[in-house]
Amino acid sequence: MSLFSGTIQNLENALSRADIKQKVITNNIANIDTPNYKAKKVSFQNLLDQESSRLEAIKTDYRHVDFSDTDSNYSIVASGDTSYQQNGNNVDVDKEMTELAQNQINYQALVERMNGKFNSLKTVLTGGK
């Protein structure tokens, strides 16, 4: 039996993903005036596919979804199909700032949940004192 029952590890992984997303968003904002810079986005689809493949599923019909493994947990994708500025840059500062705020709220919620788990363990270890 694990002391943390996997919750701490899941929270740690979620914090790592939020950190990666934060870095990509701030990089986009920092390059708002860079000519021909294309905004990047973190895609966790590979991670979702990987986790889905761990599910045990029985395929009883050819139309059912196939579950398969993938190698990487995330990818950073540049969106090169648009340009918002004359210099070829496609960073939308309003969109980036919104995503930054959402990511910060998510990160803070994860940190608070992690603190709650540790406080619960502390209470158990000190006997509620």
UniProtKB/Swiss-Prot annotation:
Q: What are its GO cellular component terms?
A: bacterial-type flagellum; bacterial-type flagellum basal body, rod
Q: Where in the cell is it found?
A: Bacterial flagellum basal body
This protein's major location comes to other
- Is Iron-sulfur among this UniProt entry's keywords? no
Disruption-associated phenotype:
Lack flagella. Altered cell surface properties including greater softness and lower density of the charged groups in the polymer layer.
Q: Name one Pfam family in it.
A: Flg_bb_rod
Top-level taxon: Bacteria
Q: Which UniProt keywords apply?
A: Bacterial flagellum
The biological process GO terms on file are: bacterial-type flagellum assembly; bacterial-type flagellum-dependent swarming motility
The role this protein plays is: Structural component of flagellum, the bacterial motility apparatus. Part of the rod structure of flagellar basal body.
Q: Which family does it belong to?
A: Belongs to the flagella basal body rod proteins family.
What does the annotation say about its assembly with partners?
Answer: The basal body constitutes a major portion of the flagellar organelle and consists of a number of rings mounted on a central rod. In Gram-negative bacteria, at least four rings, L, P, S and M are present, whereas Gram-positive bacteria lack the L and P rings. The rod consists of about 26 subunits of FlgG in the distal portion, and FlgB, FlgC and FlgF build up the proximal portion of the rod with about 6 subunits each.
The record's listing under NCBIfam families reads: FlgB
The name this protein carries in UniProt is Flagellar basal body rod protein FlgB
* Annotated organism of origin: Bacillus subtilis (strain 168)
